[in-house]
Amino acid sequence: MAGPSRLPDKKQASISSFFTPRNTSPLVNLSQNASKKPPPAESKSSKSTSSRKRPEPQTDDSEDDVPRDAKRRRSNGPSAATDTEDAVASLKLSSSSRTERYALNSSRPSQDEQEKEEDVAERKKKEELHRKFVKKLGHPDSMFSYRQRDTESAAVEGEGEEGEDDEEEPAPKTTAKKKGAKTGKLTPMELQFLEIKRKHMDTLLIVEVGYKFRFFGEDARIAARELSIVCIPGKFRYDEHPSEAHLDRFASASIPVHRLPVHAKRLVAAGYKVGVVRQIETAALKKAGDNRNAPFVRKLTNVYTKGTYIDETGELDQPGETTGASSGGYLLCLTETPAKGMGTDEKVNVGIIAVQPATGDIIYDEFEDGFMRREIETRLLHISPCEFLIVGDLSKATDKLIQHLSGSSTNVFGDKSRVERVPKSKTMAAESYSNVTDFYAGKAKDSDERSAALLNKVLKLPEAVMICLSAMITHLTEYGLQHIFDLTKYFQSFSTRQHMLINGTTLESLEVYRNATDHSEKGSLLWALDKTHTRFGQRLLRKWIGRPLLDQQRLEERVSAVEELLNNQSTAKVDKLVNMLKSIKADLERSLIRIYYGKCTRPELLSTLQTLQKISFEYARVKSPADTGFSSTLLTSAIMTLPSISPMVTAHLSKINAEAARKDDKYAFFLEQHETEDISEHKLGIAAVEQDLDEHRSEAAKDLGKKVPVNYVTVAGIEYLIEVPNTDLKRVPASWAKISGTKKVSRFHTPTVLRLIAERDQHKESLASACDQAFSDLLSQIAGEYQPLRDAVSSLSTLDCLLSLSTVAALPGYTKPTFLPSSHPSFLSITEGRHPIAEHLLPNGYIPFTMSLGTLSSSASSPDPNPTSPSGKPALAQLITGPNMGGKSSYTRAVALLVLLAQIGSFVPATSMSLTLSDAIFTRMGARDNLFKGESTFMVEVSETAAILRQATPRSLVVLDELGRGTSTHDGRAIAGAVLEYVVRDVGCLMLFVTHYQDLAGVAEGLTVGEGEEKRRGVECVHMRFASNKSRTSMDDDAMEVDGDGDGQEGAGADKDEEEEITFLYDLAPGVAHRSYGLNVARLARIPRKVLEVAARKSSELEKEVRAKRIKGAMGLVGGVLYGGGAPGDQEEKLEQLVGLVEQL
């Protein structure tokens, strides 16, 4: 009778075991066994309910997490335990057997505390809930009545039960509630989150909870939308709003730990400010501390935005992710102050500083800008920032410009930019000076004279830049990136006059970085030139293209280096360079800056150091410039820097275990002789504990009455379990804690095993912390050598760019440009030049052109000593006419692009090219309005033209395309003529002037430059040739005109049966095209024939009317000239007018 009497006790325990936390302490188990009393008599219903349960939950098969085949093998004999261990071990992550012993096992019951985080009061509440639960299930109809509960209460309760294990279960909902009464309270962990969230309301928080990262409230809804993950409903607001009074949990969403970098990057790329809240104490150390019953301590450890996100997995904008050109990755700080009155013609003083955290580049500038904000636009288009930090208030014009350029995901930067604003006090200048001084003075205390020089350099910055620098230091301190400003070697002024000025309008008109169709890189000048092998080389090439050189010596050095690489193609020394660059898979520039910030991973550090070591070994024998095999100073100086980094790189690699670093194994990362004392101490501690555990097997065997030491087994990740057959349970001491079991065996931990496991866990967690600290110290040591390493990478990027330009130079038809001395008058000559982009895109190639502007001095050396223009008489400017779609704009773009190519040091697609250096390229092309500024098409035209007239110098190249098209014919013609005359006579720069106002030829003929013997023609009239074919019912031989000037059209006797077809020859010829043939373009655009017939008739009538007026005017002038009258000067003027009218006729 003794056996059946124990059954009710076991049945009752089976119910309570599901709701009472399992205690593994042997002392508690001992006290519980000692205080056992006979169970009270149970009712029949209770017995019937309990009789349907298994006799003991610890022996239920469902508690064993090992696969069924493993269980089956274990039950067959002692060898089954070994099979079970193999099955479990196969599920673990691969790591070396040598270091696996140091990794903390995350699935033991001793870490349940990390997943539960309940205080004593919550435990008592759970016990009360258990008592009520057993009471309600004490009759057969309990489940039926449970299902009849209010559906809303059941749904809310269901949401709570599906929460994580680290949160307490809410009390059951009652059907009768007072309106507006709270249904429960937040968990301690949620209260902890709420406290952090209220301090960072503008930040989307990702919270570490156990072995997941979770989002709460509105953050969860945002994460669910952006990351396509599930959001469990609950509270979305962070205040006690009555509308959510019936909810007792925050809405939540979760992601796995290993996916944090991926999801954080996606949220940052979407424009959010993301914060990561981590647990800063571990389970084993917490258990040994005083706050074992309190929630884990959590703090905001990382904050990321679009401009500050740096991680080990690469850039935010991966190649091919967007259709537009990616942004430059810069964080730009901007402030402005009014220069004069804030009126319609407002001017502002602007200060900017742009930081690229991923590479360490810093750009600053201070300038005055007019009401059109052209200067700001130019810098924004060059820098392409992904994030703005605005200090103080901006004027409406500046604010609208920033919104226009960055406010959508399809803007010219390629993606939506994030904007953050900070206030600007009246004493901001003094505060900024003090802040920057304190920042750099702190660096100077513990360093050498270099820090003092660094401080002096920074304090010389303009006031507006100083304000931006102070704001940026404060801003980046929040993200842990303020150390970037230690590297003042990489401070660059945007407006240094060592480079050609290319404003934003020119960048867009010439399609330098992206095409004008879909804003992608294909079809741009960068696309045509980019033959680089590395990412850092590609970034440098982009800078070269955007900032052509004005220093002729540097330019000659760069061209000579490209020429030498071209002449030595397929030689061993050039192939060695190419193969070395091709072998570089890592982005060394970004890897170095991540090392500097301490954000580099172990595999990335190994890859970076090994790559640098391989590069330095390639040129280890280079001791002098002669050893490089090249004569170019640019090539030799770049190669000479590579072997200099070999000692420091080799010294760091000698400390690292390459195999462990490749597997990201922190415990074996350092070779044993280079391990710190803390690492060695904790490894010895773990070994000692494991030795004690091994010796304890004999003691456990004695307790069980066995002579042979027991064997430990590992089941479901729980180590050091002692298996005892259920037939021998009588021998098990009462102090042993049962962990799990099956039908045939039970598994226990002895008090000694529990104590030793806890001690080992403390050693393991301390070891992990010591390994991380040692790795951080190594990164700090390498960061101290950042500048020589960065110089080596800069040399590699220079070599990559030069090789890219030499690859382009090897294309058919490319030639080396010739630069005339600075003392030479402005001059440009191109023989058989081609468009550098269009020739790659057009299936039939590009028809070359020959042109000259300016005057070639007799003393200048040139491969083309007598360059000729189409007319044989080069002038300062060209007036270009021709039919629509005849190639006028393409020709002017090609000329500007060839000048830009020559001044970045590239060969050019032409037979020959001679030029003086241009300090700027200005363009005014196309017709567009500017709605966000309230500017019409013509307003945009004249505003851009006015900016050009103010900034152009005699050394500039100006391209004006169809100026005056946005207004009436008379006004447009008058403005175009006045601008043409002003540029030629007053500015005196090289200019290409495209127009459909044929009568401007008369203005052009009267413009001259120079005095006396130096006097020469100011404007040359040229046109794009075409062939005109008139088809009639009976075709005659005179219906074809090939000269292209249109003068054969007037006397052809056009009638309604006549059709005219135009064939574009795309060739430059002297003279003026007196017709634009717009109807031909309309025919190509498939305008309805009836519309074309009416348009042709109207065009003919207008031409006849204008012709009649000109004849009448000419007759009047003839009479005035023949019969005299008036002053002698009037006679000469009338004669000139008569000549002009006759030419037009």
From Swiss-Prot:
SUPFAM superfamilies cross-referenced by the UniProt entry: DNA repair protein MutS, domain I, DNA repair protein MutS, domain III, P-loop containing nucleoside triphosphate hydrolases
Region Disordered, annotated ranges: 1-183, 857-879, 1030-1056
Annotated Polar residues bias: 13-33
GO biological process: mismatch repair; mitotic recombination
Residue ranges of coiled coil: none
Residues at which ATP binds: G882, P883, N884, M885, G886, G887, K888, S889
Record localization: Nucleus
Region (Mispair-binding domain), start-end ranges: 183-307
One Pfam family of this chain: MutS_II
Ranges of compositional bias, category Basic and acidic residues: 121-131
SMART domains: MUTSac (SM00534), MUTSd (SM00533)
Domain of life, per lineage: Eukaryota
Function: Component of the post-replicative DNA mismatch repair system (MMR). Heterodimerizes with msh-2 to form MutS beta, which binds to DNA mismatches thereby initiating DNA repair. Msh-3 provides substrate-binding and substrate specificity to the complex. When bound, the MutS beta heterodimer bends the DNA helix and shields approximately 20 base pairs. Acts mainly to repair insertion-deletion loops (IDLs) from 2 to 13 nucleotides in size, but can also repair base-base and single insertion-deletion mismatches that occur during replication.
Alphabetical list of NCBIfam families matching this protein: PRK05399.1
Subunit structure and binding partners: Heterodimer consisting of msh-2-msh-3 (MutS beta). Forms a ternary complex with MutL alpha (mlh-1-pms-1).
Family to which this protein belongs: Belongs to the DNA mismatch repair MutS family. MSH3 subfamily.
Annotated protein name in UniProt: DNA mismatch repair protein msh-3
Organism listed in the record: Neurospora crassa (strain ATCC 24698 / 74-OR23-1A / CBS 708.71 / DSM 1257 / FGSC 987)
